[in-house]
């Protein structure tokens, strides 16, 4: 069986980081975007994941290792983006969650219990370069920002992999935000003046 070419972890991490940073720069989160991309797959540097990749070993959580590195700077919401970059943004959970619960707290506890393979100490994972954030309850604005960062990371991850597999694929630039807003407004205008009997009640 002919073996497919393998993209190195370093190349994928750097490519994803640059793409994610460029996307996130649009709303002032370039540094967070870069770190999310740079560390989202740190867990692939574990012996467990390499066995999965090279020898069809058991499935391994590769998303939590990098998330925990970022979480050490109190960037919990960014860590949640990384933790869920394949499975979806996790609920943050509560202190009652046991290790392995499908929440941020559950996976954090599973990590602390060493039930998730650690990164191979011989792999040179770069340090997380983010300022520590004060611990506080997330606001609505932070919740929205988190979803934007999550979208940036998922898109960057997918596009970097696509580029490696298929080469550079030309993509349309799409319409700008002003054009899209006008199009949405025209669509919503249909409901401004109710004309049906039901809408007039």
Locate the predicted segments by residue.
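N-terminal pre-Walker A segment at the start of P-loop NTPase domains
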Residues: 189-201
